[in-house]
């Protein structure tokens, strides 16, 4: 199968071994499907039919062909067609209507994909959009030689005319919603369309450039970083396409005279098409769904709805925060993404929760009306995470050009902080003075440690309204106290977690960058925690007082071939712990599931036995006695205390019941 040019600038999805063809016509913006009658295979075709009828092989429908699955991958652009999502009813409807002529043209209903011609979003390769762009450019230039947009850009902006792709955005994309809006650009949820046929949903960054060469270079740096990933990554955002086009500006744009304005005139914009993550970003998820904090952007109706849901579920899930399983899933996904970035020599430099995206939405306990799902899945599952926004990334060894506040200051490593007010690159201390440090892979690891702190506590260790000078001082002086943080976690009455999470944070937040573990080491450490679990044991409480020994794990140079080259292959990857829809057959996941089921059974037994013992004590003692009061207190503690403390409270009830029985029947 291949994409080949056809008359009037059309594209044909073509396979020379079968008897059908799909034509994409940019002139009319339509898709057309042609198919040769299989019963006439032995007959002679005329020259025109032989030239135009080529095949798109389908596994079922009017005509069935037997061919390998590889025939559904275009060798020119790499785009996959999913043969399992074929609209069979549409095929049968057309078959019953007698559409079996030697060459029959089928119209495409609005907002539908013909004959199962459906693409998985991730299967759209960069070459597909490049082919579409070349075809669109050919048609646009052919029909509009006096390109008004090109003349306008030539007189006013530094970008050459031939870099613009006029009309590409409006021709092939429709905006569904606004995902985010900042001072320098916007992010939209868009659907890729050809005519009225919707082919996939993506996230699209539209960044006005104007005459700001520095800003243009920064945007191109992000594109180069994304382009350096030559294969599909499990935990890095997937980049699909980039192009330049004149469009109305959003935010501040530098004009030809160097001034800034926020006018709505058409200016050069760079469009970056990438993977759409329906779960939003990690920061919003933690604040709004995990710790139940209202967002400033939420409407009163949304807040009322959340309040009613929370009130309805009151008492069903008293603890907030994430479980150990969920924390490990998040940290491991981010560490994997960092490992892959570092393996190709890239430093992210702006790693923070808002740049970590959830592939699917996270459903909190308060949002889950299904009691079974809330009890069985909520503490074990968290959506897979990908790292996005590589606009600040740089190659290892490059000199920094800023103040040390490239991204959000709170997530910046202390060794990068330059004391005092922000300075420009022109006033940055010289390299020879050695008064500042360069970004390294360890800088990203400190950011990962601060992300760990944020997802554990739902906040950062700094006051939110600090002056920038005071904030720099706090960051420089911050030291992670493991025991103190464990006490803080207990005082906040969050879900109990494994102490090794705190030891991991301590290692990542070391002020000395040489003392921080690498992304590969963090990933291997978390995997080792899973592998060492034993069926039937308390999975996350085993070795609870032991510290993580990073020195026992071999340190590797991050700038090596990516480990994902060996075994990441499309969707056959376990990205989270555990995902119900994925085929998880690893030993660690089996152990985790066994522990979860056993632990739930034990907790229910503790509660039932405690209630029975309390009834026995009341029957054996007088009303108002100290034994009855103590039994009620212990019963309440059994229901309210963390799971790992219920056993000792239940044993205390057994002792009280024994004393009560002795007083009644012996004395």
UniProtKB/Swiss-Prot annotation:
Keyword Transport in record: no
SMART domains listed in its UniProt record: S_TKc
Keyword Transferase tagged: yes
The EC number(s) this enzyme carries: 2.7.11.1
Primary enzyme class: transferase
Residues that, per the record, bind ATP: 179-187, 205
CDD domains, A to Z: PKc
A single GO molecular function term of this UniProt record: ATP binding
Null allele phenotype: Hypersensitivity to copper sulfate.
Superkingdom as given in the UniProt entry: Eukaryota
Active site: 350 (proton acceptor)
Record key words, sorted: ATP-binding, Kinase, Nucleotide-binding, Phosphoprotein, Serine/threonine-protein kinase, Transferase
Catalytic activity: L-seryl-[protein] + ATP = O-phospho-L-seryl-[protein] + ADP + H(+); L-threonyl-[protein] + ATP = O-phospho-L-threonyl-[protein] + ADP + H(+)
GO CC list: cytoplasm; nucleus
Residue(s) carrying Phosphoserine: 96
InterPro entries per UniProt: CC_SR_Kinase, Kinase-like_dom_sf, Prot_kinase_dom, Ser/Thr_kinase_AS
Domain Protein kinase residues, every copy: 173-530
A Pfam family assignment: Pkinase
Extra information: Present with 892 molecules/cell in log phase SD medium.
Family per record: Belongs to the protein kinase superfamily. Ser/Thr protein kinase family.
Protein name: Probable serine/threonine-protein kinase IKS1
Biological source species: Saccharomyces cerevisiae (strain ATCC 204508 / S288c) (Baker's yeast)
